[in-house]
């Protein structure tokens, strides 16, 4: 009799645990949806005649964007989810075949990434440069682009330079004029040869309250008016972590 009651009690606990997990999942999904689509804080105003004239005097610049931990975070079905809180919903999945094995990646978009891409694509020519394999990076970039044709130029692991177990990214291979190209990347080692052409950003994994991309918009808005991006970005070297 006692053992039967214990079994029923355990079954009840298991059921309650599953219900609680489901509730947490739905709550987190609603929170993320609210944060992603709430009114954005950075307002865009029409340029004044003076600003339009100034912009006409400088060349349009190229903004290079990293993917993992900069715009998105992902984990695959064979990898522990240590970086993502239980119950955190993913935004989309990517299915690829690696070494003849099917792998499914669960991808989380950094908060406000869609709005960020919409805005900066009006100011810059965008380029994706990731140290990930092309089969994965291309699929993620397709999802982020979402038919807008703003992420057409892409560079992958084969375009990187191996460097003591990591990869560096050669910006001069994208644009020979370093006056008008810069990268946003969470890994300082990736742009170690071009510190004056880089904006560091904190690595992102799953924080739904993150606003790093929004915080960059005022600076990016102003940077497009400069003759040489290095004249501004060289002053921020103290922000880069040591590598």
UniProtKB/Swiss-Prot annotation:
It is found in: Membrane. The keyword Chaperone does not apply. Its EC number is 3.1.3.16. Pfam families: NIF. GO terms for molecular function: phosphatase activator activity; phosphoprotein phosphatase activity; protein serine/threonine phosphatase activity. Keywords: Hydrolase, Membrane, Protein phosphatase, Transmembrane, Transmembrane helix. It catalyses: O-phospho-L-seryl-[protein] + H2O = L-seryl-[protein] + phosphate; O-phospho-L-threonyl-[protein] + H2O = L-threonyl-[protein] + phosphate. GO terms for cellular component: cytoplasm; endoplasmic reticulum membrane; Nem1-Spo7 phosphatase complex; nuclear envelope; nuclear membrane; protein serine/threonine phosphatase complex. Residues 56-223 form the FCP1 homology domain. Gene3D superfamilies: HAD superfamily/HAD-like. Belongs to the dullard family. This is CTD nuclear envelope phosphatase 1 homolog. It comes from Drosophila melanogaster (Fruit fly).
């Amino acid at each position: 009799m006692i053992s039967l009651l214990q079994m029923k009690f355990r079954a009840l606990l298991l059921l309650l645990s599953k219900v609680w997990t489901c509730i947490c999942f739905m709550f987190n999904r609603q929170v993320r949806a609210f944060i992603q689509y709430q009114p954005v804080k950075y307002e865009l105003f029409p340029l004044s005649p003076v600003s339009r004239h100034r912009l006409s005097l400088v060349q349009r610049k190229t903004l290079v964007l990293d993917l993992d931990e900069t715009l998105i975070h992902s984990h695959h079905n064979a990898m522990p989810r240590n970086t993502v809180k239980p119950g955190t919903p993913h935004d989309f999945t990517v299915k690829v075949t690696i070494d003849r094995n099917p792998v499914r990646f669960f991808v989380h978009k950094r908060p406000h990434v869609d709005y960020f891409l919409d805005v900066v694509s009006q100011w810059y020519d965008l380029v994706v440069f990731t140290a990930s394999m092309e089969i994965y990076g291309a699929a993620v970039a397709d999802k982020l682009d979402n038919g807008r044709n703003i992420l057409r130029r892409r560079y992958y692991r084969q375009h990187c330079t191996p460097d003591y177990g990591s990869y560096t990214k050669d910006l001069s291979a994208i644009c020979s004029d370093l006056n008008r190209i810069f990268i946003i990347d969470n890994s300082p080692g990736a742009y170690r040869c071009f510190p004056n052409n880089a904006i560091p950003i904190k690595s992102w994994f799953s924080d739904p309250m993150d606003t790093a991309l929004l915080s960059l918009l005022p600076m990016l808005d102003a940077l497009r008016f400069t003759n040489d991006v290095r004249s501004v970005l060289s002053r921020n070297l103290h922000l880069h972590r040591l590598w």
